[in-house]
Amino acid sequence: MAKNVVVIGAQWGDEGKGKIVDWLAEEAGGVVRFQGGHNAGHTLVVGGKKTILRLIPSGILHEGLDCFIGSGVVVSPEALLGEIDELNAAGVKNVEGRLKIAPTCPLILPYHIALDQAREASRGKGKIGTTGRGIGPAYEDKVARRAIRAADLLHPEKLREKLDAVLAYYNVQLQYLHNAGPVKAEDVMAVIEKVAPRIAPMIADVSRVLNEKNKNGEKLLFEGAQGALLDIDYGTYPFVTSSNCLAGAASAGAGVGPQMLDYVLGIVKAYTTRVGSGPFPTELFDEVGAGLAERGHEFGSVTGRARRCGWFDAAALKRSIQINGISGMCITKLDVMDGVETINICVGYELPGGGKTDILPCGSDAVETCKPIYETMPGWRESTVGVKSYDALPANAKAYLKRIEEVCGAPVAIVSTGPDREETIVLHHPFA
């Protein structure tokens, strides 16, 4: 019997993880964010009301449910408190009482944001597409062992000494490499002194609490951010995020042993999207792509940036299934494909020199040279919006899902036919 479930994005992010985590949270005893920062939004729609979460786990809307931010997450205290205030204003109960933050979480502070934005501006046409929220520099500090972490908020007398050393490093870069102004220690301390009284009570030994919950038989839900193809190691590098987005990162990022991860649910959009720069073999530049973007409301929930749209890429998904050990797939936004007369599925790529491959190559340069090989299927005219039974889906929609299973080599467990929590078809429940 599966007890703990990891939910990850199996493409380039924006697959609809938030809705599915919110839906699964009904049966969970705790929901955990284990990587990323506030650079991506998870959108939930409950009873027609939309909520966008960036740092707080998507289970927070369930009254009484404990939520956790593991040490793999880089936390902006200001963004976190802003999100809490939004939830409080919306009537969500006891947010601060139910949210626990690992003491080992690196903090995102003003100098991270300043350097992130200065670097991106300096890249010119070579921009990576960072959100400019300081995520990358914060992860750099973690690896370089100079991060200011959540636990440091409990010891302000030592924090100032650490801050002075960090700013000496940052201001050299800002002033001499990027021709930007320095960040003042007094300004950073003002932020810290403002947020510390509210953040400190939420700091807890997340790893210990999660392991205790597991021993007590409570189901745990691990919520990933971004997508596997943006992973710092296995994504289309350098056009990737700064963290490990794979299912395996749930263990280290939450502080639990890998034996506690029973089921990996890969969230997969019924077509493919990507935000920002980077190779995208199946990208569409015609009216079909424009139609997907319009019907799918393909704009970033945090940045507002338009997402690039393309055909379903089964070869890319194969890579994701391989590196995540995906147990089952949740296909989202099936309803956006309604009315597309002819559908293409990318089943592989032609390579320079005449070769072929049925799986996404590693690295951006290799992917850039790939030419998609398509299979064509008939679409469907009937509406799938809000359909809650697999048998009620159009025959061609079911054939599309079946072909995705066959080409990718993983079963479809869930189908989402709309943004609301209830617009969901369950073929196999991950917690079953």
Swiss-Prot record:
One of its GO terms (cellular component) is cytoplasm. Keywords: Cytoplasm, GTP-binding, Ligase, Magnesium, Metal-binding, Nucleotide-binding, Purine biosynthesis. Pathway: Purine metabolism; AMP biosynthesis via de novo pathway; AMP from IMP: step 1/2. It is found in: Cytoplasm. Its EC number is 6.3.4.4. The active site is at D14 (proton acceptor), H42 (proton donor). It catalyses: IMP + L-aspartate + GTP = N(6)-(1,2-dicarboxyethyl)-AMP + GDP + phosphate + 2 H(+). It is an enzyme of class 6 (ligase). IMP binds at D14, E15, G16, K17, N39, A40, G41, H42, T131, R145, Q226, T241, R305. Its cofactor is Mg(2+). Plays an important role in the de novo pathway of purine nucleotide biosynthesis. Catalyzes the first committed step in the biosynthesis of AMP from IMP. Belongs to the adenylosuccinate synthetase family. Homodimer. This is Adenylosuccinate synthetase. It comes from Neisseria gonorrhoeae (strain ATCC 700825 / FA 1090).
